[in-house]
Amino acid sequence: LLLLGVPGTGKTWVSEHLAAAISGDSTLLVQSTAGTTEEVIRYGWNYASLIARGPTAEALVPSPIMTAMRDGKVARVEELTRIPSDVQDALITILSEKLLPVPELGEAVQAVKGFNVIATANDRDRGINDLSSALKRRFNTVVLPLPATAEEEVTIVSRRVADLSRALELPAELPAADEIRRVVTIFRELRAGLTEDGRAKVKSPSGTLSTGEAISVVNSGLALAAHFGDGRLAPSDLAAGLTGAIIKDPVQDA
């Protein structure tokens, strides 16, 4: 399964909860970066043991994906498109044949029933690599869009802000719906490049201004209100967070 969408649409949250619900374990994770190598996806070696005894089963260091194959669990690959394209293709045999060859030992790991992979990928971000057609065909792709309506987005932001405030034990009053609606409206207008009433065009910034960023802005404002204010969220508490979310590139977004 490939969860595709812009940053901040809840792909990681969905993948984590799906893995936990299906196999009772969401920790078999490959966190992708531009420096991710095939060893991270397939397997590596304990080099001290490898030098002393050569390639043995004891010297082999399984990747999270190999562990998931052996245990019949779900492996997660975060930010798949950040992995270089030639390394991504190491997944093709694993996904199509459910098989991971280990030629150094003259054997292969056959996936146990229950094994699967849930990957997430951004389709609008810097530093991403296109997926090959062969790899795309081996995934069932689900696109996670931004909320369709302002009301839906306000509801999502309100719920997540309340959850995070409880988790962080912030001694601040939860923001009124009007404050959250103001942040959501700003984000939606900038994403669309048009004011809510359709009368004026506005410049869209280079960032995605996702729902996740709206949650972060409101939560950051609550923390400022709790520790440096009177415990009530004020527009001034949101201002710094809004500036940081909107102006990602000082030149392009000026």
What is each PLM-predicted segment?
Residues 9, 94, 186, 238-241:
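Short acidic/histidine-centered micro-motifs embedded in hydrophobic/aromatic stretches
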Residues 37, 61, 210, 232-239:
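A diffuse structural propensity rather than consistent per-protein peaks
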Residues 44, 138, 156, 160, ...:
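Residues that form generic nucleotide/phosphate-binding pockets
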Residues 1-168:
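AAA+ P-loop NTPase catalytic core and its hallmark functional loops
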Residues 154, 161-232:
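Conserved AAA+ ATPase small/helical "lid" subdomain
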Residues 226-254:
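C-terminal engagement/docking regions of AAA+ P-loop ATPases
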